[in-house]
């Protein structure tokens, strides 16, 4: 054991993370499990492997690690895996930008394709889907290695032998297995239906991936003609006029009752459309009568379904006007007008449609400027459209009240931390407007294990899917051939075609409990850890990850996948805006970690209450600086105590701590020492209860408050007695230092491990969590009054602008119940350098003070 003369935090991360990994102290040992209650299992969030982690990841993953370390010290066998979410759009976009490539599924596979980083869109080259996926996997693996380095530096006590990816063969196998299970049970189905569509990514989007943004627009008033009158409607989307299939008004709106059942003619395109009543129409919105297009928004979908209207789509998957006029446009004038729109972007189509309306005087008045909410894909930059597409869905309770009630009940069975987050889950569940859309028209993702028979013209018969045998999983249907067919029948008449859609990333991430627990590969492991003890996650993905995981678990196991869930808050920038990579205000943690150290950053994260948003100013991170000061103080306090146990006669040489154990509690007899241990018991109890309730900030504050009081007051009071070799003081210092190191170990693992190594040859992170000492004697008020005494003495010297070393010839001081501290007056007088002291019962204050030789 080599204790430095001046303890330092530098280098501790590298020193101890290597030792932890090599000694495998955090590995989950299945053979040690004798009963489920021995295990504490964590369904760790797999971070998206696309670029860099930001400070928000450090924040929330620290919260989880604190609980993992605490439970391990509580005697649990902790299952704490790490996954990488390398499946989906973020990875695709990163690969496109990094290598300047675009995926073209029509191109053949190029073997041994090697590409370097380019980052130049103008030089983008097209590659095959298989080559594109290989690049995604290559770049993801590089990112994952960097992520693992950062997590190790942060001190996460993850079992690195329990890792998984959401796009490797195991993940594909598991996802395809449960998809086929869902198809067989009727929980998964295919439908041709209106779909929210992102024209930039050219893929369907689920309800859970939508966000509303306030957009400035205009209401345009258009004139529709019928036999007797002009009907005026207001719309923000005149470009959809060619897709109008009806006008709708509220059945009780007297302005339009006489029109119900009649028809009007659309301007420009001359289409005859009905005027119909529907209670979803809003009399106070616009002119009170609405144009129904297929489709402008979700309300259009509702009207289309409820009123059994025809479909007249005019937008393609790229967000342009379709090439051919829809069937309802039959007039020569209308078809000529549509031809001028064909192929235009929607913004160009809007401009041209308005020009045509103005030219025939079908625009009434001036446009009315508004700000209104518009739906966007959370990762997109253009408003969502609604297209009729073929998609795969999983039933989520949208149209099944019994399933909704069951999912609500499963939510209530969980312990939510904080409890208020349950309401978000329930609100989402009761506000669904569709089943869960799980198919995506992208390239990187779990392939659907499906082929379709073709008719005698080679067209896919989507109502006649071919499913594989479970023994053939995992597979890619664009490469594999269904049983009973040969490769030369692919795409041929009376042959087969592959499903080219891939599963939404949440369709795989919803199975992380099964994936991390190796449901298919190691049933014994899964049985030991499921249901998991904890799902930690962010509040923004309750509607996606948490909700979808409960659905999949209900279908697979008829139970919730965890017993509790801990929801972290957001990290805000100094302007109180949420930090995120998409907004460009997220800070990477490396610079902060390098500058202040992992323990300091962990301290900052631990100070925040669970579920509460926390601001961070990286230019002046006050709490991080406080955390660094705390970690350094732990080292200095431990060094002081260790050096007190050097050879008492010569006070030289290295300390021999082995002779200090086991601790002889009978040696503790001084009233001040016993009072401190009473307060320590209180600290242990409060900290333990706080951590059991996921209140890491309270646990840290409780222990930290005790520790600073211990250092600033108790140590100063007993220092002379300890230097003199008093067994009661020495034993108390040893006991308290050992226990405080344990109490702080989940929060600042590096400083506590370093300090512990000076006392012991084992790791503090394999020790048992402290239990209360339950000493029968000791008055907790004694230490409080003693601290008040010392505070007044220090304050008096500071006010007189004197050094704390200045001696006091005479002190008259008032304290409540001063008789309590009479037994320790010798300690107090020595600590305050006081010759004579007179105690008076009363409010705490100095009544008179005379200094000896002045020391400034």
UniProtKB/Swiss-Prot annotation:
Places the protein is found: Cytoplasm
Stored CDD domains: Anticodon_Ia_Val, ValRS_core
Catalysed conversion reaction: tRNA(Val) + L-valine + ATP = L-valyl-tRNA(Val) + AMP + diphosphate
The enzyme's E.C. designation: 6.1.1.9
Comment block on domains: ValRS has two distinct active sites: one for aminoacylation and one for editing. The misactivated threonine is translocated from the active site to the editing site.
Annotated GO biological process: valyl-tRNA aminoacylation
Job description of the protein: Catalyzes the attachment of valine to tRNA(Val). As ValRS can inadvertently accommodate and process structurally similar amino acids such as threonine, to avoid such errors, it has a 'posttransfer' editing activity that hydrolyzes mischarged Thr-tRNA(Val) in a tRNA-dependent manner.
Protein name listed in UniProt: Valine--tRNA ligase
Locus of motif 'KMSKS' region: 578-582
Gene3D superfamilies given in the database record: HUPs (3.40.50.620), Isoleucyl-tRNA Synthetase, Domain 1 (1.10.730.10)
Keywords: Aminoacyl-tRNA synthetase, ATP-binding, Cytoplasm, Ligase, Nucleotide-binding, Protein biosynthesis
Binding site for ATP: 581
Family, similarity comment: Belongs to the class-I aminoacyl-tRNA synthetase family. ValS type 2 subfamily.
One term under GO cellular component: cytosol
Assembly description: Monomer.
Gene Ontology terms for molecular function: aminoacyl-tRNA deacylase activity; ATP binding; valine-tRNA ligase activity
Motif ('HIGH' region): 47-57
């Amino acid at each position: 054991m080599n204790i430095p003369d001046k303890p330092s935090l530098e280098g501790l991360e590298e020193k101890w993370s290597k030792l932890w990994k090599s000694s495998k102290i955090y590995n989950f040992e299945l053979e040690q499990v004798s009963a489920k209650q021995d295990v504490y299992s964590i369904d760790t969030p797999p971070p998206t492997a696309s670029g860099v982690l930001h400070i928000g990841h450090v924040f929330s993953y620290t919260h989880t690690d604190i609980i993992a370390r605490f439970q391990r010290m509580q005697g649990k066998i902790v299952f704490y895996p790490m996954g990488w979410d390398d499946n989906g759009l973020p990875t695709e976009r990163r690969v496109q930008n990094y290598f300047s490539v675009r995926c073209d599924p029509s191109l053949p596979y190029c073997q041994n394709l090697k590409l370097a980083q380019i980052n130049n869109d103008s030089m983008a080259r097209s590659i095959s889907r298989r080559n594109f996926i290989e690049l995604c996997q290559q770049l993801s693996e590089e990112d994952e290695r960097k992520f693992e380095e950062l997590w190790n530096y942060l001190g996460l006590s993850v079992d690195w032998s329990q890792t998984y990816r959401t796009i490797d063969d195991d993940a594909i196998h598991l996802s395809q297995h449960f998809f086929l299970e869902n198809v067989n049970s009727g929980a998964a189905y295919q439908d041709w239906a209106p779909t929210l569509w992102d024209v930039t990514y050219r893929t369907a989007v689920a309800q859970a991936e939508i966000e509303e943004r306030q957009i400035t627009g205009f209401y345009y008033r258009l004139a529709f003609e019928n036999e007797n009158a002009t009907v005026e409607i207001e719309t923000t989307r005149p470009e959809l006029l060619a897709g109008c299939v009806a006008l709708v008004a509220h059945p009780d709106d007297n302005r339009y009752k006489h029109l119900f059942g009649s028809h009007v003619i659309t301007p420009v395109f001359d289409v005859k459309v009905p005027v119909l009543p529907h209670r979803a129409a809003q009399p106070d919105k616009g002119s009170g009568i609405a144009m129904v297009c297929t489709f402008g928004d979700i309300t259009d979908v509702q009207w289309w379904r409820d009123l059994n209207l025809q479909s007249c789509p005019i937008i393609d998957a790229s967000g342009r006007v379709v090439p051919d006029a829809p069937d309802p446009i039959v007039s020569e004038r209308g078809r000529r007008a549509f031809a001028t729109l064909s192929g235009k972007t929607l913004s160009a189509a809007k401009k041209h449609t308005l020009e045509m309306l103005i030219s025939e005087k079908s625009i009434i008045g001036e446009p009315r400027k508004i700000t209104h909410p518009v739906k966007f894909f959370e990762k997109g930059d253009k408003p969502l459209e609604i297209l009729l597409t073929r998609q795969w869905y999983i039933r989520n309770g949208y149209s099944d009240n019994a399933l909704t009630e069951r999912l609500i009940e499963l939510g209530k069975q969980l312990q939510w931390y904080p409890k208020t987050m349950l309401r978000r889950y329930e609100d989402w569940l009761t506000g669904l407007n569709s089943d869960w859309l799980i198919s995506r028209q992208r390239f990187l993702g779990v392939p659907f294990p499906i082929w379709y028979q073709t008719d005698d013209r080679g067209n896919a018969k989507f109502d006649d899917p071919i499913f594989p045998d479970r023994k053939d999983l995992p597979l890619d249907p664009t490469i594999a051939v269904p049983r009973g067919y040969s490769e030369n029948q692919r795409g041929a008449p009376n042959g087969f075609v592959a499903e080219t859609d891939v599963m939404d990333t949440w369709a795989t991430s919803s199975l992380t409990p099964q994936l991390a627990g190796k449901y298919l590969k190691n049933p014994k492991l899964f049985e030991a850890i499921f249901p998991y003890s904890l799902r930690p996650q962010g509040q923004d993905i309750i509607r996606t990850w948490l909700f979808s995981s409960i659905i999949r678990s209900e279908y697979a196991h008829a139970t919730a996948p965890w017993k509790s869930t801990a929801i972290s808050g957001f990290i805000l920038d100094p302007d109180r805006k949420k930090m995120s990579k998409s907004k460009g205000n997220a800070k990477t943690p490396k610079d902060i970690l390098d500058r202040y150290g992992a323990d300091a950053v962990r301290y900052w994260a631990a100070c925040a209450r669970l579920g509460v948003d926390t601001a961070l100013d990286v230019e002046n991170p006050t709490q991080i600086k406080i955390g660094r000061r705390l970690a350094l103080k732990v080292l200095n306090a431990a060094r002081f105590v260790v050096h007190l146990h050097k050879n008492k006669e010569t006070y030289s040489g290295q300390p021999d701590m082995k002779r200090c154990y086991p601790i002889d509690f009978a040696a503790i007899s001084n009233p001040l020492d016993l009072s401190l241990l009473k307060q320590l018991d209180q600290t242990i109890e409060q900290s333990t209860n706080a951590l059991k309730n996921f209140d890491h900030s309270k646990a840290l504050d409780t222990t930290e408050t005790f520790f600073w009081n211990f250092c600033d007051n108790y140590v100063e009071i007993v220092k002379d007695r300890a230097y003199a070799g008093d067994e009661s003081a020495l034993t108390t210092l040893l006991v308290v230092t050992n226990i405080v190191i344990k109490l702080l170990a989940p929060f600042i693992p590096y400083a506590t491990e370093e300090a512990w190594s000076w006392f012991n040859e084992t790791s503090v992170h394999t020790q048992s969590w402290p239990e209360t000492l339950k000493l029968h004697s000791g008055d907790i008020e004694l230490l409080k009054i003693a601290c008040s005494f010392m505070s007044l003495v220090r304050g008096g010297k500071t006010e007189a602008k004197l050094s704390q070393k200045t001696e006091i010839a005479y002190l008259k001081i008032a304290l409540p119940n001063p008789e309590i501290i009479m037994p320790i007056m010798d300690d107090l007088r020595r600590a305050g350098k006081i010759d004579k002291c007179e105690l008076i019962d009363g409010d705490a204050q100095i009544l008179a003070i005379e200094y000896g030789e002045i020391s400034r």
